[in-house]
Amino acid sequence: MKNKALTMTIVANMTSNYGEGLGNISSVQKVFRNGKVYAIRSRESLKNAIMVQSGMYDDLEVVVDGATQKKVDENKNASNCRALEGGYMSTSPTTKIRKSSFYLTDAVACNEFINETRFHNNLYLASSYAKANDIKLKEEIKKSGLRPYQYEYDNSMKQYSITFDLDKVGVDVNYDTEASKEEKILRVKAILDAIENLALVVKGNLDNAEPLLIFGGIGDYKTHYFENVVRVARNELDITEDLKRRLDNGYRVGILRGGNFENESDIIEELKPISMAEFFSKLEEDVKEYYE
C-alpha cells in the first residue's frame, strides 16, 4: 500500500459563523488579507458540522474531569470509535494525544466583505407576555421583555480545502490498534457523503452548502494541493496553467452546472469537468481500491 492522501478544494455558498459579540450586536468571523476583509466559516465550525452530519459523532462520549474532553481508553479509542477519528487529547490518567486523520481550512469568502446588518426583535413574544400579564407594552418595555438585537450577515461563495492522510484513518498508536479496512472505507465515505450534501445552520439560516466546484482526488501530496491555484473572484474562476498542470497529475474536477460561475462555459471547455455526482462516486471507488 502506498502512503497517499485524499485532498479536495471546494467552492460552495454558505453563511459565515459568528465571533464574540458586543451587547446585542453579533459580528461574523473575518480574516484580513492584502489589506482587505473577508468573511469566513471557521474550520472548527465546518469540522463539527461534517462530523455531526456524517454520523461520525453518533458514538461520541464526553467526560468532565477537570476538563471537558472525549472519552478515551483501551476499550474505546480511534480504532473502534468513529467520533475519535477527528483527533483527541486525553489527560486522564496520563496525557495521550491522537491527531486527526484529516484537516480542514477555514472557508474564506471569494470576495471582500460587505457589511449587511440585520435588525430584529422579539416583539411577538413580548406582546404575548404583555397581553397575558396586563402590561402596557409601549410604556413598560423592560417589564415586557422586549429586546431588540442586530447582527452582521454574510452568505457568499466561499472556498475551503480538506485533506486526509489515508494511512492514519482508523489507526490509534496510543493503544497499538487499528480498524479494519472495511471500517476505514466506511469512515472516509461517510465524510465524503456529508461534504457532497453539506447543510449548515447558523442563527436560524439553513444553508445548502453543497459543492459548486471541486478539485481533488488521491495522490502523493499530503497537503491542500489545490489551495493555492484555485482562485474565484466575482463568481469567475481564474483558469491558469498551474491549475491545469496539477489536474494532469491524476486529479479530477467536478462542477454543479447551473450558471453559478460567470465563465462556466470556459470551465467546461478548458477543464472538462465531470458532474458532482460522478466526482464523488469515482472518489469513493478510489478510496475502496486504495484500502483493498
Predicted regions and their residues:
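RNA-binding basic/glycine-rich loop and surface signature characteristic of RAMP-family CRISPR effectors
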Residues: 1-292
